[in-house]
Amino acid sequence: MDFKGESKKLELYDFTTVADELDVDSAALRAVLTVETGGSGFDAAGRPKALFERHYFYKFLANQPDKQVEAVEKGLAYPKWGEKPYPHGSDAVYAEIDAACEIDLNCALRSVSWGLGQIMGNNHKMVGYDDVQDMVKDAMESELKQLRQMAAFIKSAGLLDELQNKNWAAFAKGYNGPQYEKNQYDVKLADAYAKFA
């Protein structure tokens, strides 16, 4: 799969538009984007910023043992998060994604966090897509579509109140998982918000 689309960048008013739709401070929304991806949804090659989660790939291949064994042998899957470090650089990440897609396209795309908000492909239904490939195609098209995916996830995951109230610890736990404190995700959100407020 070619992961290059139109790669349209956000306009400043896009933040305000989506923030108004969510009824949140645009600085709070920008803080999340800054912590997740540095505020940019595309890499230098015009592909959506992505992170391949090998432990999810392992999990999603559980009912396909031959594929799971192949993925493990190729270093693309393992049972627990953190067993191996993430690859450095977007090209290395996409090399893993491409290799995983050759094993199982759907499971591979579901195992990646995509774009500005780093929304897991497995959450495609939560953000309004019947098919993960459609979610990825929209992420390839524009940062605005990536931002809308993030907004839909925030609403679907029940995190809107936390973002509106700038309850960074509760938001971080819901958005980034129970390990958020390990990386000081809540502190990073508060610091980023202070820069934009």
Predicted regions and their residues:
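Catalytic glycan-binding domains that act on GlcNAc-containing polysaccharides
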Residues: 1-197
